[in-house]
Amino acid sequence: MTRKYFGTDGIRGHVGQAPITPDFMLKLGWAAGMAFRKQGKCRILIGKDTRISGYMFESALQAGLSAAGADVLLLGPMPTPAVAYLTRTFHAEAGIVISASHNPHHDNGIKFFSGRGTKLPDEVELMIEELIDTPMTVVESAQLGKASRINDAAGRYIEFCKSSVPTSTDFSGLKLVIDCAHGATYKVAPSVFRELGAEVVVIGAQPDGLNINADVGSTHVGQLQKAVVEHGADLGIAFDGDGDRVMMVDHTGAVVDGDELLYIIATDLQERERLTGGVVGTLMSNLGLELALKAREIPFCRAKVGDRYVIAEMLDKGWVLGGENSGHIVCAQHTTTGDAIIAALQVVLALRRRGQTLAQERLAWHKCPQVLINVRFSGDRDPIAHPSVKAACDSVTERMGGRGRVLLRKSGTEPLVRVMVEGDDEIQVRGMAEELAKVVTEVCA
């Protein structure tokens, strides 16, 4: 069945443009409340990032949920994975996150977690969509839901993060720079690492509702690179606006992406005989990662891009580790979804165990040159299906002679076509990527 509102990662868009409007959020809250209270009264958690629009949408969702007879537990600004965790621990029927992840402040969105802290099954999302398009009715006054605020949510999540490493863990002597993207991790992430003994320098932790992800965070690491070098830090950690992506910077200022972090965690788990199965990556994962894991006899498979597909593949195979080069990393022995703080903890712990620097670990394997170009498009036409684009892809693939990969895909969250070319010659790879991007741009014009 075709989805009307839900995309690959919930509902997302520009604030004030349908469906990211207060009236829609009211109806969405009501529809979700009706869907989850099939068995009677229910409790639903709401968390959000630091966007100014989050407060407006929180109120609208709360009103809709209450009208459907659902009690609401308000967490305030809290990382997306924290909402998943707290939904489980409070035995709530569902959790709702108000966030547009790494997008600018003028975007916002909604994603749901089931009572188990996992992404909602497709059938539940479709049920909510059907209810949105039905007339809204309010339960009897005695059945209206109540709202309350969970004041110790941050402390609960901090302790949960720390529980993902041994109680003997001591990061004393380690100097870190943490970039919170002016987002949902700004209170909890520095506390986690400080309480484990690290010296922490914090940037990107002054949210004003408008500066989330603005030249900071996992998609804009320039300030972190500069701060790491200036402060003589051992490494830097950058989170995105909602705390489900992480990138790192070594002491020289070099960026360490999700593929490289996955390799560090995977090999550490293997050495400690705690790696169940192999590693799930995506179509965008660097070919070098696959080859490096193969050299360590660690199985590797690719899922479609998007953490929900990575998690689905992990569950299908019974594996405990997966992620994306963008920094979504899922450590299933600890969490039910991608958790940037917990992934960062596993990396730092692995470095301490091995007595290695992040720079040394970064050089442990060779990344194949990979060029990614985003091309914006509009309208309903699929540029990837255009004959000119297909012909250009076939031409590039043939010229690579089996020594690389070509991938074109539409973003699940933005009107973008992502053009990716990977191979063993950086100049050739860039030229071919630009050639393909030019064709896609012409088709989209």
Swiss-Prot record:
Entry's Gene Ontology BP terms: carbohydrate metabolic process; peptidoglycan biosynthetic process; UDP-N-acetylglucosamine biosynthetic process
E.C. code: 5.4.2.10
Record's keyword annotation contains Iron: no
Domain of life of the native organism: Bacteria
Signal sequence interval, chain numbering: none
One GO location term (cellular component): cytosol
Active site as annotated: 101
Catalysed reactions, as listed in the record: alpha-D-glucosamine 1-phosphate = D-glucosamine 6-phosphate
GO molecular function: magnesium ion binding; phosphoglucosamine mutase activity; phosphomannomutase activity
Cofactor note text: Binds 1 Mg(2+) ion per subunit.
Positions that bind Mg(2+): 101, 240, 242, 244
Record PTM Phosphoserine, positions in chain: 101
Cofactor(s) required, per the database record: Mg(2+)
Post-translational modification: Activated by phosphorylation.
InterPro entries, sorted: A-D-PHexomutase_a/b/a-I (IPR005844), A-D-PHexomutase_a/b/a-I/II/III (IPR016055), A-D-PHexomutase_a/b/a-II (IPR005845), A-D-PHexomutase_a/b/a-III (IPR005846), A-D-PHexomutase_C (IPR005843), A-D-PHexomutase_C_sf (IPR036900), A-D-PHexomutase_CS (IPR016066), Alpha-D-phosphohexomutase_SF (IPR005841)
Function according to Swiss-Prot or TrEMBL: Catalyzes the conversion of glucosamine-6-phosphate to glucosamine-1-phosphate.
Family: Belongs to the phosphohexose mutase family.
NCBIfam families assigned to the protein according to its UniProt record, in alphabetical order: glmM (TIGR01455), PRK10887.1 (NF008139)
Record protein name field: Phosphoglucosamine mutase
